[in-house]
Amino acid sequence: MLAALEMKSSPTAPPAYAAIPSTNAALSVLQNAVASGTGANEVMRNEKAAYGAATEVLKDDETTRMLKMQVNEYSLAEMRAAYQKLKRQSRLLHYGELLCLALVLGLTFTLMASSTAAVLQSALQQVGITGHVVTGILTSLAIFLQHHRTRVLKRKRSVKRDIVKRMTYISLARRMGTRSPETGCRKVTSGLPHGASGGSGTRQG
């Protein structure tokens, strides 16, 4: 009877459940976020690019992460320079487009005024063109600048998305403890005793 009571009162350990790997769970969540349709705006597209970079970090092993970090760090400087160049081009094209439209409006209002229309028409006839021809040329130039600016903006958004992706990969890889090859080499060399790295030290008797 006493043995039965001791068996009933003895504590029992809870059943062991299989642990869910955190890396696989995070990878599944990121893959679902990347595959959840197309981004509605530019912010969501950049966010999906960051999710894609995070997915790559979890998939890659330590050596692959180290190599990708080095390549991404080298390419980031060039991509930032290209982004700034595209940004300046877009601004200049926008200013040119506004200038053409302002000239078209000014020329149109000038031709509508009876006091200055005759003077302007006579001045244009001396060079063999009319006010309508100048207006058409300026309008066509404004349309061309607008189309070219649209292509530049598209390229600019693509470069920005690549920058976000590479910066996210580098940041997450560093948080996971991955070091760049150059940093690792510097730390190993600094930890060696004096004269051991070069191999050219002289032995004293």
From Swiss-Prot:
Signal peptide: none annotated. Residues 196-205 have a biased composition (Gly residues). May play a role in the release of virions from infected cells. InterPro entries: Orbi_NS3. It holds the Pfam family Orbi_NS3. Residues 177-205 are annotated as: Disordered. Belongs to the orbivirus NS3 family. This is Non-structural protein NS3.
